[in-house]
Amino acid sequence: MNTKYSEEQGDGSFMKHLILASGSPRRRELMSQVGLDFTVVTSDADENIKEMEPEDYVRELSSIKAQSVLEQYADKDDSVIVIGADTIVYHKGEILTKPKDEEDAFRILKSLEGQIHQVYTGVTICSTHKNVSFYEKTDVWVYDMTDEEIRDYISTGEPVSYTHLRAHETGAYL
């Protein structure tokens, strides 16, 4: 991806250097679809944080990721804007994180089928001058599936790759 570093526009303003602090293929795809010119820099920050309400959890993790990447650039380029994001599933009072393996993915999908759960995404946009964090919550219903359907879906590798088993990322709606 080509990145524009403070390239002067016709009106004398300057283009900011936009960085996505995420390795998520889906987030890259979304930013590309809206025509943003950006660089991907993944965060190596410690993401182990204390338990808290899901909306606070995703905002905190998105902030940790964005701030970690911003720190790498803050002294060199004050035109940097960093976007960090984190997504989790929340079901029956529990934050569900990325499945450890196929059996864990099966257990999680089995617990979600036929029920509504919430998907929370927190986003932080930060620069050396300002930070903004917000979250969105979506109710998701997973239909009842046979064990074979679940195992077939898991065999694609999608559930283990995505934090919250979002089949809609690849079109395999559940």
Task: Give the role of each language-model region.
Residues 8, 164-174:
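Residue-level detector of conserved catalytic or cofactor/ligand-binding positions
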Residues 5-14:
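Short, Lys/Arg-enriched N-terminal segments with co-localized hydrophobic residues
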Residues 48-50:
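Generic structural signal for helix capping and beta-alpha/helix-loop junctions
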Residues 16-36:
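N-terminal beta1-alpha1 ligand-phosphate binding loop
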Residues 39-46:
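A short beta-strand-loop structural module common to alpha/beta enzyme folds
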